Amino acid sequence: YPLALASIVNDGWSLSSLHCQLSGFLMGLSVIGSVFNITGIAINRYCCICHSLRYNKLYSSTNSLCYVFLIWMLTLVAIVPNLCVGTLQYDPRIYSCTFTQSVSSAYTIAVVVFHFIVPMLVVIFCYLRIWALVLQVRWRVKPDNKPKLKPQDFRNFVTMFVVFVLFAICWAPLNFIGLVVASEPASMAPRIPEWLFVASYYMGYFNSCLNAIIYGLLNQNFRQEYRKIIVSLCTTKMFFVDSSNHVAHRIKRKPSP
């Protein structure tokens, strides 16, 4: 967060209003994009596991590209109204330009409902249906003429389920605060402790750091790639250390004129 660091050093926003709007816009784009992508992945896992016979038709290469395009177009449409309502402002509590919950009660409620609650309900529905199928397979009550649950599909489902749970836990406090503030901005906004808002804000953005850890713990392919990266970095470091030692040794052995 270079801009946040600059704000901390300067004790305030030192760039133009346009930069502030752009910064808040990009941050909002990433957050809403994450919500919609998690929802899209949940629907994908639901179709793959619960409707596997129709999955290849539903998620052909062309259709998959259309789904990705649709998700990001919806994300763009969802974030643009912030520029019209004027909710992207500098918040000195977090030294960042972000969504201001107290500007418009109706808009804040709409954001929380359509950008968090509704997508989370869709994801919960998809994962509950998948878990029901998993339990059927585990207890062998699933008819033999239905599609079977593949181990790889189950592992991918568990990974994305954990990602969703952590996302919901990390972002729920900030959205709950938004609903509280939107209920009565004039009276409720000052009653929210600053430390609570700051903690919930950074807790939400800390979720992005957790994803890499979750993928590494639950996905073998990620673990292998992490191992390659670590080995490569260690090898490169050892190479530079050995080269530096060799050069230093040659300088010491070189006779002085």
From Swiss-Prot:
Disulfide bonds: 20-97
Alphabetical GO biological process terms: G protein-coupled receptor signaling pathway
Residue ranges of the TM segments: 23-43, 65-85, 108-128, 161-181, 195-215
Stored Pfam families: 7tm_1
Extracellular topology ranges: 5-22, 86-107, 182-194
Keywords linked to the UniProt accession: Cell membrane, Disulfide bond, G-protein coupled receptor, Membrane, Receptor, Transducer, Transmembrane, Transmembrane helix
Cytoplasmic topological segments: 44-64, 129-160, 216-257
InterPro entries referenced in this protein's UniProt entry, alphabetically: GPCR_Rhodpsn, GPCR_Rhodpsn_7TM, Mel_1A/1B_rcpt, Melatonin_rcpt
Localization: Cell membrane
GO CC list: plasma membrane
UniProt membrane topology term: Multi-pass membrane protein
Keyword Membrane among record annotations: yes
One annotated GO molecular function: G protein-coupled receptor activity
Family from the record: Belongs to the G-protein coupled receptor 1 family.
Function in brief: High affinity receptor for melatonin. Likely to mediate the reproductive and circadian actions of melatonin. The activity of this receptor is mediated by pertussis toxin sensitive G proteins that inhibit adenylate cyclase activity. Possibly involved in sleep induction, by melatonin activation of the potassium channel KCNMA1/BK and the dissociation of G-beta and G-gamma subunits, thereby decreasing synaptic transmission.
Name of this chain's protein: Melatonin receptor type 1A
Species of origin: Bos taurus
Gene from which the chain derives: MTNR1A
